[in-house]
């Protein structure tokens, strides 16, 4: 009996130490609390990679830059933390991207 209890305690401790990789939905105060906890009160806006003006056309040199951006689809659609963690589940690792 003691061995089973001891094994259960160690198993629970191992699960708690390994972290939770299961995605969860975080909204409102819960999102702010989790972000504060994960980032140790030092969170900021997630940055997108810099795209230099010479790469503006994305290899679509025959198009005007504005039209190339429209066809790209991904550019200009930066997702904020609410889109990533409130509208759909996210993991703690995704929250770390905002630290």
Curated annotation (Swiss-Prot):
<dbReference type="GO" id="GO:0005615">
    <property type="term" value="C:extracellular space"/>
</dbReference>
<dbReference type="InterPro" id="IPR017097">
    <property type="entry name" value="Bombyxin"/>
</dbReference>
<feature type="disulfide bond" description="Interchain (between B and A chains)">
    <location>
        <begin position="27"/>
        <end position="86"/>
    </location>
</feature>
<comment type="function">
    <text>Brain peptide responsible for activation of prothoracic glands to produce ecdysone in insects.</text>
</comment>
<dbReference type="InterPro" id="IPR036438">
    <property type="entry name" value="Insulin-like_sf"/>
</dbReference>
<keyword id="KW-0372">Hormone</keyword>
<comment type="similarity">
    <text>Belongs to the insulin family.</text>
</comment>
<keyword id="KW-0732">Signal</keyword>
<dbReference type="InterPro" id="IPR022353">
    <property type="entry name" value="Insulin_CS"/>
</dbReference>
<keyword id="KW-0964">Secreted</keyword>
<comment type="subunit">
    <text>Heterodimer of a B chain and an A chain linked by two disulfide bonds.</text>
</comment>
<feature type="disulfide bond" description="Interchain (between B and A chains)">
    <location>
        <begin position="39"/>
        <end position="99"/>
    </location>
</feature>
<dbReference type="InterPro" id="IPR016179">
    <property type="entry name" value="Insulin-like"/>
</dbReference>
<feature type="propeptide" description="C peptide like">
    <location>
        <begin position="48"/>
        <end position="76"/>
    </location>
</feature>
<dbReference type="InterPro" id="IPR022352">
    <property type="entry name" value="Insulin_family"/>
</dbReference>
<keyword id="KW-0165">Cleavage on pair of basic residues</keyword>
<protein>
    <recommendedName>
        <fullName>Bombyxin A-1 homolog</fullName>
    </recommendedName>
</protein>
<keyword id="KW-1015">Disulfide bond</keyword>
<feature type="signal peptide">
    <location>
        <begin position="1"/>
        <end position="19"/>
    </location>
</feature>
<dbReference type="Pfam" id="PF00049">
    <property type="entry name" value="Insulin"/>
</dbReference>
<feature type="disulfide bond">
    <location>
        <begin position="85"/>
        <end position="90"/>
    </location>
</feature>
<dbReference type="GO" id="GO:0008083">
    <property type="term" value="F:growth factor activity"/>
</dbReference>
<dbReference type="GO" id="GO:0005179">
    <property type="term" value="F:hormone activity"/>
</dbReference>
């Amino acid at each position: 009996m003691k061995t089973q209890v001891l094994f259960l305690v160690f198993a629970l401790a191992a699960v708690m130490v390994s972290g939770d990789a299961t995605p969860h939905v975080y909204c409102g105060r819960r999102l702010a609390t989790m972000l504060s906890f994960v980032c140790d009160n030092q969170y900021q806006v997630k940055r997108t990679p810099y795209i230099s003006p010479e790469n503006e056309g994305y290899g679509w040199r025959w198009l005007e830059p504005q039209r190339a951006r429209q066809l790209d689809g991904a550019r200009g659609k930066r997702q904020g933390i609410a889109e990533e963690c409130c509208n759909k589940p996210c993991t703690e690792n995704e929250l770390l991207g905002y630290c």
